[in-house]
From Swiss-Prot:
Species of origin: Helianthus annuus
SUPFAM superfamilies, per the entry: Nqo5-like
UniProt membrane topology term: Peripheral membrane protein
Catalytic activity, as annotated: a plastoquinone + NADH + (n+1) H(+)(in) = a plastoquinol + NAD(+) + n H(+)(out); a plastoquinone + NADPH + (n+1) H(+)(in) = a plastoquinol + NADP(+) + n H(+)(out)
Record EC number: 7.1.1.-
Protein's recorded name: NAD(P)H-quinone oxidoreductase subunit J, chloroplastic
One of the Pfam families matching this protein, by short name: Complex1_30kDa
GO biological process, one term: photosynthesis, light reaction
NCBIfam families hit by this protein: PRK12494.1
Family, as annotated: Belongs to the complex I 30 kDa subunit family.
Length: 158
């Protein structure tokens, strides 16, 4: 079964994969990293101009990393929003996904957090650097294969 957006993407020959619907009836689509930026621009023009959230997670130890975007389209009024969830998977060895900062500015800190915690590099992000961990931190703390150091020192703020 396809949702409205998935049918529209098929009609316009935009490559994606439907991953089904969640309990609220929101469709989840998988987009390849190489197609993500152009599809993001198309979605914005189509009316998905509100990025509700962006997050990332480690799918499995040694497996893929996923960047997840929740988008909303409010066309017929605030009480009837159309929502979609986009998942972009990246290989663990060199996880690179195009940044959508230039499409939705609100993704700034969220992509930085995903970089800081999981090591996903968002290409063309204007300030991609650590946001929660010290710049000297080694590794990506939310990866399932991350080994926490036995000792670390956090310096006092001066």
């Amino acid at each position: 079964m396809q949702g409205n957006l998935s049918a529209w993407l098929v009609k316009h020959a935009l490559i994606h994969r439907s991953l089904g619907f969640d309990y609220q009836g929101i469709e989840t689509l998988q987009i390849k990293p190489g197609d993500w930026h152009s599809i993001a621009v198309i979605l914005y023009v189509y009316g998905y101009n509100y990025l509700r959230s962006q997050c990332a997670y480690d799918v499995a130890p040694g497996g893929l990393l996923a960047s997840v975007y929740h988008l909303t389209r409010i066309e017929y009024g605030v009480d009837q929003p159309e929502e979609v969830c986009i998942k972009v998977f990246a290989p663990r060895k060199d996880p690179r996904i195009p940044s959508v900062f230039w499409v939705w500015k609100s993704v700034d800190f969220q992509e930085r957090e995903s970089y800081d915690m999981l090591g996903i590099s968002y290409d063309n992000h204007p300030r991609l650097k650590r946001i929660l961990m010290p710049e000297s931190w080694i590794g990506w703390p939310l990866r399932k294969d991350y080994i926490a150091p036995n000792f670390y020192e956090i310096q006092d703020a001066h």
